[in-house]
């Protein structure tokens, strides 16, 4: 009767659960972190280390967090935690952006506009309360993601101290000569009733009217002479302009052409039986004439654009307004006619041209910009014939103006155009350029542009294309409009002269005094302040301005209001945000940093892409393809979300779907199962008692420690360059290939069948201890909850949390004089692969069942055979086969053959051995198992 030898085996045993059950287990871990003040402990353990400062860009305090928020915060958290393991003190101070329009809109919906049911002070208080509520909700969700930080003392742009520091930052900028006031065209949203920053604009497709309008020459013969042509007496001469904004024509004050472009004088369409010659850019003439119904290009002359400068034209519908022709380098021959109508109140380039020609002072504010803040023509706007423009909204005026142009005979062509057009990011409505008195940070007055361009080159950009992108933006951006005509924000505390409009000569000093008061009483003090307290006898000569600061200025000065205020160094080591922040926070921070300190406030900038579905479509409720982070956490756990983020190339768009989440869960399961198997085989192992020195380890165990050392070097380098996808892939490959398909499979025999205290078994356990101690650190920044759980099962004495340690120092490379070198193992593993390939058809054809039923013969070159023959007795354990024979052969490589064994199977280790049945007490066991059960135990050297 056969005996049950199972009790003589040392099978894996661990309480570490097979199932992660993350939605239930993570909250308990989070509760413990809260109870133990994990962040404070982390900082205490890191005290005295070099500082690594990742400065948090503030999310807006409005609404639930979405997947983009989760991506951003988790990437930051991975970096912070990896830096702690790398030997740094890496504080993380989260922040919130609290002022601005979205909160105003939320309060207006609930209470009405300012001055209706609430005065401005009450309105701001409601905004403050609303922001505080939103922060609480978002903070809860961020913490649930496993984000570790100073959640009890975050920075908030609504804090009195922050608002005061923001005013002090503005005072510095005033001191440096960067602040100017001017009437310039700025992005304007009629729904907001305010100017918009570049970062508050998004481009969406829009259908616009597209018209070609003729501007008749007032001295046609002189203009024709420029083209060396003689104008017949019965022929009109005009320059057609092409525009998609007919509503701007009442503000049209000039025509611009390109000075170096080639223009031709061509035969145009007749009007009321009268011939008409037109001036068109040569490159666009045929296409333009086709729009006018003319197939043949008949040229009467040619000239450069510069030759037409200062010729005078009639306005298409205001007969008493003369239109000069000016030169503008912004005019191109890409589309249209090569001539653009110029409305300096509604276009930045138009405004610049008028500035260059010194023409701005010739016109009233209403002539430059006849449109009010709501998008309605002013009462002073002249009618267009019988069409009254005053009081008419510009979008309604567009088709009426086109009809009026047609009646007057100056409309050459009209159609509709589908194009990308700027919209307000909040209201999703089209915006315009509108000249209004605003406060600007000048890009030129104190050489801010050139200094910012230089500073960009001293920053490391991830990905590298980020540098070229922001360089292009800074090169081409206009002055920064920092004033807003809203209620909820930090005031621009300037006193301006009642008559000249000039700021008080001691503005910066006054602003600092006001900042001191704001720090104690908040921004309301500015509006209630009796200015005689600060200005004394000058008070009657000055008035306060009521504009507030752009919210991008709020977040743009956090390097001053947060880092300096908390004693942290500038510049920060890293800013990390979405790719849209090249024109947002990265840029506003850069400009304020350079304006104040002549340096960028960051050493490195890293950007991540946006989340899309598996088809590359933006996630949205309307498409029904959105996946919320809260749903992932409830069903799968935060670590699954964290693993997806880490495993994705975040430099591009990040695809997510249920199928991708399933694959991520499978990857997580592989990591968890590997950790569980390692822990299971550490049952009964105490590193203080049983750890085997590296030099005494079995060769295979020593090699896997060497492989782990190599991987740790790779992983550390990848964390340093923020390549988390490489880390995940490296870990998964290690789990599947080095461990799953090789090391763990091979060492099962030793771990299960040897005596508990056998040196060969303790050697394998030592290797697995080293692997687990390193492995838990590798995954800790990414799988924070799982690493915390795994760490608690690691045998031996250690710190309370894996993040209180640094990278594992128990790994080491194989020395060059090792009995089996890394090169030897490369060859042996290649041989092992060949053995597997030889056995596959034998298994498929039923010659053998398991590989243990095969006996292997390896014929190799003499020197290779001589190297491998000492290993012969143990090669069967590496191959997990029956006996292995190595013979020398006349070959450069090696040849593998196999045959089915005729030997009996051991009932305990399942190996097929010739000595089974030789022992009377254990007739079913091989000699090796007998010595492991009843004797001193087997000896192993190699595998």
Curated annotation (Swiss-Prot):
Cofactor(s) this protein cannot do without: Zn(2+)
A cellular component annotation (GO) from this entry: cytosol
Signal sequence region: none
Pfam families on file: Anticodon_1 (PF08264), tRNA-synt_1 (PF00133), zf-FPG_IleRS (PF06827)
EC number(s) per entry: 6.1.1.5
Domain remark in the UniProt entry: IleRS has two distinct active sites: one for aminoacylation and one for editing. The misactivated valine is translocated from the active site to the editing site, which sterically excludes the correctly activated isoleucine. The single editing site contains two valyl binding pockets, one specific for each substrate (Val-AMP or Val-tRNA(Ile)).
Protein name: Isoleucine--tRNA ligase
Organism: Xylella fastidiosa (strain Temecula1 / ATCC 700964)
């Amino acid at each position: 009767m056969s005996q049950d030898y199972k009790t003589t085996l040392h099978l894996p045993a661990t309480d570490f659960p097979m199932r992660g059950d993350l939605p239930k287990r993570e909250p308990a871990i989070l509760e413990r972190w809260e109870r133990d003040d994990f962040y404070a402990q982390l900082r205490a353990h890191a005290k005295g280390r070099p500082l690594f400062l990742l400065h948090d860009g503030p999310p807006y305090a409005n609404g639930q967090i979405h997947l983009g928020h989760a991506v951003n915060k988790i990437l930051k958290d991975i970096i912070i935690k990896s830096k702690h393991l790398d030997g740094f003190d890496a504080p993380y101070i989260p922040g919130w952006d609290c002022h601005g329009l979205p909160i105003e809109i939320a309060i207006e919906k609930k209470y009405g506009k300012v001055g209706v049911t609430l005065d401005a002070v009450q309105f701001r208080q409601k905004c403050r309360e609303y922001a505080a509520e939103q922060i609480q909700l978002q903070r809860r969700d961020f913490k649930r993601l496993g984000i570790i930080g100073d959640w009890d003392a975050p920075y908030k742009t609504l804090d009195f101290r922050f608002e005061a520091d923001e005013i002090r930052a503005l005072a510095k900028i005033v001191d440096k000569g960067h602040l100017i006031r001017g009437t310039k065209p700025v992005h304007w949203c009629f729904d907001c009733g305010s100017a918009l920053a570049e970062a508050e604009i998004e481009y969406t497709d829009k259908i616009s009217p597209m018209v070609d309008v003729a501007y008749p020459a007032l001295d046609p013969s002189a203009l024709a002479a420029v083209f060396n042509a003689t104008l017949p007496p019965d022929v009109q001469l005009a320059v057609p302009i092409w525009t998609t904004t007919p509503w701007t024509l009442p503000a049209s004050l000039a025509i611009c052409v390109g000075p170096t472009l080639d223009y031709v004088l061509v035969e145009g369409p007749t009007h009321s039986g009268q011939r008409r010659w037109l001036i068109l850019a040569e490159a666009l003439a045929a296409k333009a004439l086709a729009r006018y119904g003319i197939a043949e290009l008949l040229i009467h002359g040619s000239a450069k654009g510069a030759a037409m400068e200062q010729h005078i034209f009639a306005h298409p519908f205001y007969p008493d307004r003369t239109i000069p022709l000016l030169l503008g380098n912004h005019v191109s021959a890409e589309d249209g006619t090569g001539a653009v109508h110029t409305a300096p109140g509604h276009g930045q380039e138009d405004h610049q041209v008028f500035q260059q020609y010194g023409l701005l002072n010739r016109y009233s504010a209403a002539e430059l910009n006849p449109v009010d803040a709501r998008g309605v023509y002013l009462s002073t706007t002249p009618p267009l014939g019988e069409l009254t423009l005053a009081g008419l909204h510009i979008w309604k005026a567009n088709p009426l103006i086109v009809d009026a142009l047609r009646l007057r005979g100056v409309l050459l062509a009209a159609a509709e155009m589908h194009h990308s057009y700027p919209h307000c990011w909040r209201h999703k409505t089209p915006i315009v350029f509108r000249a209004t008195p605003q406060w600007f940070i000048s890009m030129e007055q104190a050489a801010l542009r050139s200094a910012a361009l230089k500073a960009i080159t001293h920053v490391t950009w991830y990905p590298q294309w980020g540098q070229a992108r922001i360089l292009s933006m800074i090169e081409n951006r206009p002055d920064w409009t920092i004033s807003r005509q809203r209620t909820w924000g930090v005031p621009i505390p300037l006193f301006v002269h009642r008559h000249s409009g000039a700021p008080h000569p001691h503005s910066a000093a006054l602003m600092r005094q006001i900042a001191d008061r704001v720090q104690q009483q908040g921004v309301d003090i500015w509006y209630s302040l009796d200015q005689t307290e600060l200005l004394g006898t000058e008070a009657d000569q000055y008035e306060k301005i009521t504009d507030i600061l752009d919210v991008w200025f709020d977040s743009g000065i956090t390097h001053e209001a947060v880092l300096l205020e908390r004693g942290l160094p500038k510049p920060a080591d890293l800013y990390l945000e979405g790719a849209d922040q090249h024109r947002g926070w990265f840029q506003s921070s850069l400009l304020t940093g350079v304006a104040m300190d002549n340096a960028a406030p960051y050493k490195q900038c890293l950007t991540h892409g946006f989340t899309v579905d598996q088809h590359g479509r933006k996630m949205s409720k309307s498409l029904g393809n959105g996946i919320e982070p809260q749903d992932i956490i409830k069903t799968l756990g935060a670590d699954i979300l964290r693993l997806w983020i880490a495993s994705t190339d975040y430099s591009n768009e990040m695809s997510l779907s249920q199928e991708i989440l399933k694959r991520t869960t499978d990857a997580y399961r592989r990591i968890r199962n590997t950790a569980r198997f390692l822990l299971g085989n550490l049952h009964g192992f105490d590193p203080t008692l049983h750890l085997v020195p590296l030099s005494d380890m079995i060769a295979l165990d020593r090699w896997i420690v060497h492989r782990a050392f190599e991987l740790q070097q790779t992983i550390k380098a990848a964390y340093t360059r923020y390549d988390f996808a490489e880390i995940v892939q490296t870990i998964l490959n290690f789990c599947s290939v080095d461990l799953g398909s090789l090391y763990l499979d091979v060492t099962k025999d030793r771990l299960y069948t040897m005596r508990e205290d056998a040196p060969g078994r303790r050697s394998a356990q030592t290797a697995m201890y080293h692997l687990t101690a390193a492995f838990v650190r590798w995954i800790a920044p990414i799988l924070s909850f799982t690493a915390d759980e795994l760490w608690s099962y690691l045998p031996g004495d250690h710190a309370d949390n894996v993040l209180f340690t640094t990278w594992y120092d128990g790994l080491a490379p194989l020395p060059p004089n090792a009995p089996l070198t890394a090169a030897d193992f490369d060859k042996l593993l290649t041989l092992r692969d060949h053995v597997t390939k030889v056995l596959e058809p034998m298994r498929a054809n039923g010659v053998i069942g398991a590989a243990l039923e095969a006996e292997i013969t390896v014929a190799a070159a003499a020197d290779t055979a001589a190297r491998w023959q000492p290993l012969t007795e143990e090669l069967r354990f590496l191959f997990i086969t029956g006996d292995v024979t190595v013979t020398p052969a006349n070959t450069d490589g090696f040849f593998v053959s196999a045959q089915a064994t005729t030997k009996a199977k051991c009932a305990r280790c399942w190996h097929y051995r010739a000595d089974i049945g030789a022992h009377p007490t254990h007739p079913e066991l091989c000699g090796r198992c007998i010595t492991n059960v009843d004797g001193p135990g087997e000896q192993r050297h190699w595998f």
